[in-house]
């Protein structure tokens, strides 16, 4: 079994519990939804946030989007968070945070009891043995059926070709009508134990740019997200950078209150870091998420792009993040995607719209990892088909 060990010490809660201790400590809150055929669904919706996050966000394959904070954040947008531990033979094999909403809102009628389910970047596997994965997927099927879900959509971020998508097909899941995530191809840097070993992974010009930024006097800063006063001012400044960058480069930026609330929630949970770099000030910044053994690039912003090209501040920022992540105990740094729905796959020449972004990430030692599509499961085939058709023509 691949147990749910804490991925790294610095971000973990002060009191770390084993799986058995966690389940025992919260026995009074547990509701057994199904115990047939050796499978048990433990309702963990009311668990305290640190206990849930130790499994869902900080275990080896954990993900920040499966955290307690992320589920509660979506409550304000009309979703109801549901959290479950799936056990097989009294052994936890997976956890999942599901966002649920009514199919028809407040309207009644024959379809009034039906719901829509989405598990962002879930489920989180605690055991990757084939029989454990099958049990985890069966648990998801039963949750969807019992909660009258028309469809359950999952996008767990499993690597394409890993064999896990075969288990999905065998469990009655099918490729979703549309992907949830903008990009399926990420660039991941394998973190090394020493600076010398990490530098060997850099492209020649990248090492030069890092040295140039250092010589010019560019400085980097990591914000203490536990310090409320410093955090709020820094997040507000970062939002201004992020919004300005969105206008320059043409990507969508959510409204200030929503973005600040999601960043704040993840920061308070110890699942996000905010960094800045600049020459005589804060010129560029990056927000990063703690997802199991990976540090994940989530959002970025900068002031004048031309000045950044001159100072190479972003090169030094990425390098300092990489070194900090390696020293903290992360196994890899996910630098983010390099493809889109309209231009899928690893860029192979300059005709790809994200070719330059791909080169930038590759020069830090990033290697492409293609993740599977989103998958759907419909307990009722007829309703599921109707839902797919309705979404296709929306």
What is each PLM-predicted segment?
Residues 110-127, 294-304:
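Conserved acetyl-CoA binding element of GNAT-fold acetyltransferases
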Residues 33, 38-89, 93-107, 156-161, ...:
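A conserved beta-strand-loop-helix scaffold within acyl/acetyltransferase catalytic domains
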Residues 108, 112-114, 145-151, 176-182:
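Short, flexible active-site-proximal loops enriched in glycine and acidic residues
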Residues 135-142, 260-380:
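Aromatic (often tryptophan-rich) hydrophobic motifs at membrane interfaces
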Residues 151-154, 222, 334:
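Short catalytic-loop micro-motif centered on adjacent basic/acidic residues
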Residues 2-38, 45-46, 99-100, 171-196, ...:
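Active-site/acyl-donor-binding loops of N-acyltransferases
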């Amino acid at each position: 079994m691949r147990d749910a060990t804490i991925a790294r010490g610095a971000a973990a809660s002060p009191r770390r519990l084993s799986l058995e201790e966690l389940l025992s400590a919260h026995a009074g809150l547990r509701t057994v939804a199904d115990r047939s055929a050796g499978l048990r669904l433990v309702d963990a919706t009311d668990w305290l946030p640190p206990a849930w996050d130790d499994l869902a966000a900080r275990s080896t394959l954990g993900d920040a989007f499966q955290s307690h904070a992320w589920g509660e954040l979506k409550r304000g947008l009309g979703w109801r968070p549901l959290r479950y531990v799936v056990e097989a033979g009294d052994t936890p094999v997976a956890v999942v945070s599901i966002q649920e909403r009514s199919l028809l809102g407040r309207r009644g009628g024959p379809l009034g009891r039906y719901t829509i389910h989405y598990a962002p970047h879930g489920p989180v596997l605690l055991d990757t043995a084939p029989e454990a994965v099958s049990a985890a997927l069966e648990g998801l099927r039963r949750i969807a059926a019992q909660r009258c879900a028309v469809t359950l959509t999952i996008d767990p971020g499993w690597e394409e070709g890993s064999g896990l998508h075969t288990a999905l097909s065998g469990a009655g899941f099918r490729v979703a009508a549309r992907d949830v995530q903008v990009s399926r191809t990420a660039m991941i840097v394998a973190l090394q134990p020493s600076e010398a070993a990490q530098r060997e992974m850099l492209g020649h010009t990248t090492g030069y740019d890092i040295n140039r930024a250092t010589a010019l006097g560019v400085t980097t800063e990591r914000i203490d997200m536990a310090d409320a006063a410093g955090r709020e001012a820094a997040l507000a400044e970062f939002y201004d950078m992020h919004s300005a960058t969105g206008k320059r480069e043409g990507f969508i930026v959510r409204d200030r209150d929503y973005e600040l609330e999601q960043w704040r929630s993840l920061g308070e949970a110890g699942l996000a870091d905010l960094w800045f770099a600049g020459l005589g000030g804060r010129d560029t910044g990056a927000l990063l998420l703690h997802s199991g053994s990976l540090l994940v690039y989530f959002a970025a912003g900068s002031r004048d792009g031309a000045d950044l090209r001159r100072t190479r501040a972003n090169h030094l920022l990425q390098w300092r993040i990489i070194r900090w992540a390696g020293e903290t105990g992360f196994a890899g740094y996910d630098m983010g995607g390099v493809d889109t729905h309209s231009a899928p796959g690893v860029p192979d020449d300059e005709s790809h719209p994200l070719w330059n972004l791909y080169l930038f990430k590759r020069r830090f030692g990033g290697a492409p990892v293609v993740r599977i599509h989103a998958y759907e499961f419909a307990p009722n085939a007829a309703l599921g088909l109707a839902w797919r058709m309705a979404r296709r023509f929306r």
